[in-house]
């Protein structure tokens, strides 16, 4: 399994012949490592309804004939815009040709803007992806919560965790999350996109590594093998 960080909370996962895009916010993202029109994928996983996660999902899905997997209400929203979708709910899993996707809890909100109103579209979620003999956890946007210990029972090869604070957990809580999840490797995300979520990724990694974890902050465009 290869993982490419595309900025904010967006990642491209390559496993076997599958190309899986997670939380595709590229257009309007000052840290984006690629343009939306250059993305090639066959599946898109979306954690929740906020624009900095749904971003280019429909446009990329239509261009690539890719399947969008998201919570049920969000999947229906994407389907109404002409995308192919598969809806899940937290705790539910489904086997796809590339592997299994399970949605987990996340403590956050999940809305899309509709003029002056926010329309809520189901529960925010984390994503467990099992493919190619590896297990990846994308936490989505979330606060720290005790049930992360249950997610850790999935024997995680990698965890992608927000550290930006303000809208999600910050570095202090992310360190506790690492204790709960016990991944072999963690990558911080959802930080330094805007001043309000500015954090020192290398400093977070040093503290985590000193505590016995393996954390690798990636720059947008960097790739690693899990």
Spans of model-derived segments:
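Beta-strand-turn-beta hairpins that frame and shape the catalytic cleft
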Residues: 1, 14-20, 93-102, 130-136, ...
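Binuclear metal-ion centers of metallo-dependent hydrolases, dominated by the metallo-beta-lactamase
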Residues: 67, 79-93, 175, 179-226
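Glycine/small-residue-rich loop that forms an oxyanion/phosphate-binding "nest" at active or ligand-binding sites
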Residues: 55-113, 118
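Zn-dependent metallo-beta-lactamase
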Residues: 1-19, 26-29, 102, 203-211, ...
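Active-site environment of divalent metal-dependent phosphoester hydrolases
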Residues: 29, 50-55, 75-78, 92-95, ...
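Active-site-proximal loop/helix segments of hydrolase catalytic cores
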Residues: 113-179
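Active-site neighborhood of phospho(di)ester-bond hydrolases with catalytic His/Asp-centered motifs
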Residues: 21-24, 41-49, 69-72, 137-140, ...
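Pre-active-site segment of Zn-dependent metallo-hydrolases
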Residues: 12-50, 55-62, 73, 109-120, ...
């Amino acid at each position: 399994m290869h993982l490419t960080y595309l900025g904010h909370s967006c990642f491209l996962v390559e496993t076997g012949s599958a190309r899986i895009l997670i939380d595709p916010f590229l257009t309007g993202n000052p840290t984006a490592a690629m343009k939306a029109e250059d993305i090639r994928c066959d599946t898109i996983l979306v954690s929740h309804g906020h624009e900095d996660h749904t971003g280019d999902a429909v446009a990329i899905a239509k261009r690539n004939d890719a399947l969008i997997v998201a919570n049920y209400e969000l999947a229906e929203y994407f389907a109404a815009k002409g995308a192919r979708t598969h809806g899940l709910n937290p705790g539910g899993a489904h086997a796809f040709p590339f592997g299994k996707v399970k949605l987990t809890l996340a403590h956050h909100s999940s809305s899309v803007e509709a003029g002056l109103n926010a329309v809520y579209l189901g529960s925010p979620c984390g994503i467990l992806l099992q493919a190619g003999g590896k297990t990846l956890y994308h936490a989505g946007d979330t606060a720290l919560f005790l049930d992360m210990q249950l997610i850790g029972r999935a024997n995680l090869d990698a965890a992608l965790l927000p550290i930006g604070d303000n809208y999600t957990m910050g570095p202090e809580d992310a360190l506790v999350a690492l204790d709960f999840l016990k991944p072999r490797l963690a990558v911080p995300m959802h930080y330094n996109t805007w001043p309000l979520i500015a954090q020192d990724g290398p400093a977070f990694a040093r503290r985590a590594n000193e505590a016995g974890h393996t954390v690798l902050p990636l720059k947008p465009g960097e790739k690693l093998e899990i």
